[in-house]
């Protein structure tokens, strides 16, 4: 491919030494693209930093940002990457978690979709996998709803790929965020809401592009079973989910906060609040009971 796209990959890491070699091998083996990997390591207690430094010494595509700050979570670490990396030499920008395995054509598929003019941002389904060998498709590719981005992300952030122009606008916005927002609002959810609220076209590919590792240290994990629904119910019952929604809306679309905080508005528009039908009715049930 003579006209291969150039992709900047933003990788946030923390105590990730066990899975990083496999992850980096899968990223480095991407087909028909040119790439650079920008790494921000949260203050860790294992050999994560040394692993990246050793890899960077052998691979000029790996760039490790300055080390020593305690970010306290994946989101502020990603916001640091978004704010500091220079995207001027890249066509597209992708997020990467520290412990997943990318399919070889992950970036090529994303680049093809974005170059076709059909979308401004790309994400995809993923194949979750566990240490016991179990695998499961995590389907996030339902049709978008008018307000879904205020109540959920587009899926795992490790599948997100942005056109340069979109990322530059997002970068400009992230640089203005106060510190407490960077700790409260997940980077992938904010990225999705920012883009959708500003009219950027978002494609969720039904074809999985990543093997999404599940283990005890996952920041979010899957939301695809009854255990997940129990956790979601607990978040709703304690008002934590509502606080997250309102914090997000107040950040990316403060003019909409009055509506999104209004129970009657949400009841009237419940069909627009989530992409998946069963999630819409689950949220409706929570609204009717006054739990949300």
Sequence positions of predicted segments:
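C-terminal subregions of glycosyltransferases and related glycan-biosynthesis enzymes
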Residues: 173-180, 190, 211-292
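Nucleotide-sugar donor-binding/catalytic module of glycosyltransferases
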Residues: 1-226
């Amino acid at each position: 491919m003579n006209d291969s796209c150039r992709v900047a990959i933003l990788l946030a890491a923390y105590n990730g030494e066990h899975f990083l070699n496999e992850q980096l091998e899968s990223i480095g083996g991407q087909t028909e693209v040119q790439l650079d990997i920008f790494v921000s390591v949260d203050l860790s207690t294992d050999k994560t930093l040394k692993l990246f430094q050793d890899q960077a010494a052998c691979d000029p595509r790996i760039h490790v940002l300055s080390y020593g700050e305690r970010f306290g979570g994946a989101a502020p670490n990603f916001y640091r990457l978004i704010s500091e990396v220079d995207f001027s030499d890249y066509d597209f920008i992708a997020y990467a978690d520290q412990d997943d395995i990318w399919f070889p054509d992950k970036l090529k598929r994303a680049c093809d979709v974005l170059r076709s003019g059909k979308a401004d941002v790309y994400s995809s389904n993923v194949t979750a996998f566990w240490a016991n060998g179990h695998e499961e498709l995590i389907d996030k590719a339902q049709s978008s709803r008018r307000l879904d981005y205020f109540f959920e992300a587009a899926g795992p952030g490790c599948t997100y790929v942005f056109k340069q122009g979109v990322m530059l606008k997002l970068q400009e916005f992230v640089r203005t965020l106060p510190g407490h927002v960077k700790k409260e609002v997940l980077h992938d959810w904010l990225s999705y809401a920012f883009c959708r609220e500003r009219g950027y076209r978002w494609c969720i590919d039904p074809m999985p592009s990543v093997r999404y590792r599940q283990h005890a240290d996952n920041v979010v994990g899957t939301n695809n079973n009854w255990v997940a629904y129990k956790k979601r119910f607990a978040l709703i019952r304690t008002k934590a989910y509502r606080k997250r929604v309102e914090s997000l809306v107040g950040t990316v679309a403060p003019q909409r906060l009055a509506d999104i905080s209004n129970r009657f508005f949400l009841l009237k528009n419940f069909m627009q609040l989530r992409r998946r039908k069963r999630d819409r009715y689950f949220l409706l049930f929570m609204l009717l009971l006054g739990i949300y």
